[in-house]
């Protein structure tokens, strides 16, 4: 797992950021910050009392994979925004669009199926 995070590993975050990132964007202490920000966003999206990070051990493997994908791309969103000038504008915007679309899909899934998702995860 990422040194400071629970829902995604450093490797997953770096993969989501992609090639061409600058040294600060792939620095471990920065990816630690971005995963914590992503986890905070996800906790807020689920609402109080769910405790994604606190109850991580009880979540099923399939949902852990889903959460890792969302968390790593949300963290990548912060990393890419840290210095979007690492890429040509079109590339940076494309990367941000992918991350943002995954986040919007996650929020939409929660809006429509939150109770079912929480129950299926065993929370």
Where do the language-model regions lie?
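Core structural elements
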Residues: 64-76
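Short acidic, glycine/proline-enriched loop segments that cap or flank alpha-helices
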Residues: 59-63, 67, 87-90
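Short loop/turn elements at secondary-structure junctions
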Residues: 2-4, 73-123
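Conserved short "hinge" loops at termini or chain/domain junctions
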Residues: 1-64, 108-123
